[in-house]
Amino acid sequence: VWLSALKFIGKHLAKHQLSKLGR
């Protein structure tokens, strides 16, 4: 479960970071 949660969070954070860099 933890791995799944970390993966999900990591994806979310990565998207946010990309969005920030994109702007």
Swiss-Prot record:
Expressed by the venom gland. The modification Leucine amide is found at residue 21. It is found in: Secreted; Target cell membrane. Coiled coil: none annotated. Keywords: Amidation, Antibiotic, Antimicrobial, Membrane, Secreted, Target cell membrane, Target membrane. GO terms for cellular component: extracellular region; membrane; other organism cell membrane. The keyword Membrane applies. Its main location: secreted. One of its GO terms (biological process) is defense response to bacterium. It comes from the Eukaryota. Belongs to the cationic peptide 04 (cupiennin) family. 05 subfamily. Has strong antibacterial activity and biofilm inhibition effects against Gram-positive and -negative bacteria including E.coli, S.epidermidis, and A.baumannii and oxacillin-resistant S.aureus and meropenem-resistant P.aeruginosa. Is not cytotoxic against human foreskin fibroblast Hs27 or hemolytic against mammalian red blood cells. Its mechanism of action involves binding to lipoteichoic acid and lipopolysaccharide of Gram-positive and Gram-negative bacterial membranes, respectively, to destroy the bacterial membrane. This is Lycosin-II. It comes from Lycosa singoriensis (Wolf spider). The lineage of its organism: Eukaryota, Metazoa, Ecdysozoa, Arthropoda, Chelicerata.
